[in-house]
Amino acid sequence: MIDILLLGCGGGMPMPNRFLSATLINYRGRKILVDCGEGTQVSMRISNTGFKSIDIICITHIHGDHIVGLPGLLGTIGNSGRTEPITIIGPEGIRETVEKLRVIANWLPYEINIIENPKDTFKLFDGNINLDVDISVLELDHSSPCIGYCFYFKRQPKFDVEKAEKNKVPKILWNRLQRNEENIVLDGALYTNDMVTGEERKGIKVSIITDTRPIKNIIEFINDSDYFICEGTYGEDKDLPKAIKNKHMTFREAADLALKGNVKKLLLTHFGTAMNEPEEYLNNANEVFDKTIIGFDRYKTTLNFNED
């Protein structure tokens, strides 16, 4: 299962009841953080998530409301006792930005690996840590270089006892091969994981899009997502001219992407400071896509793999 925690749902500047953009994804006890706006640490402390197990930090773009909380968080992660490397992914300029932000966190007990402006789908390995997740990115349309993220969490195929016995695979290797250790040599014989497993099973797809106009490429990128987290800077339809000018989206535009992308659920976030009660405008999204949820700080949901 995958736990998603919306640490902050605000855009622009923090408010008394709304921290800035940050989303925490927990899978198998390891964590991926998407954006790190002001208040991220506080929200994590309130939620009792811990800091040590954050392996990947994905930054959508280099605007303060999405990254200003990063140096403090890096220091806190260091104080938590972490020594394993952390990977930071972001758009063009992320390397220079992280280096400058580290002026106030210049010594850390772990390495930082930076992936700047990635283009292809990739998997991250970090020592013995394998999140078993494919990460894809998409260039968005904002006032600074901005990327969206898609996370595909793979599911282990079912173990096939009959197949394993037919292939004469030693029982001491069954568990290792099922857990995707591809090749094992024992007593001069080669054993592969397809000798003990059945067909692949569907994983879980989570897409996060924020700070952009609703460009067509988003539809294919988010297609068939189990969970689509999207910005909704403006709730009212009449604010469309502002959304166009500032390169953001209205609730209705986000819902239209969800509908065309055939996603299962839409979670709206990144609410502008002029919007005190986002729930008042939920109908503007529901008229287009009726599986829309209005996010709030520390909103939490769990996604389960289908039983098959």
Swiss-Prot record:
The keyword Ion transport does not apply. SUPFAM superfamilies: Metallo-hydrolase/oxidoreductase. Its cofactor is Zn(2+). The active site is at D65 (proton acceptor). Keywords: Endonuclease, Hydrolase, Metal-binding, Nuclease, tRNA processing, Zinc. Disulfide bonds: none annotated. SMART domains: Lactamase_B. InterPro entries: Metallo-B-lactamas (IPR001279), RibonucZ/Hydroxyglut_hydro (IPR036866), RNase_Z/BN (IPR013471). Coiled coil: none annotated. Signal peptide: none annotated. One of its GO terms (molecular function) is zinc ion binding. Binds 2 Zn(2+) ions. Its EC number is 3.1.26.11. Homodimer. Belongs to the RNase Z family. HAMAP family: RNase_Z_BN (MF_01818). This is Ribonuclease Z. It comes from Clostridium beijerinckii (strain ATCC 51743 / NCIMB 8052).
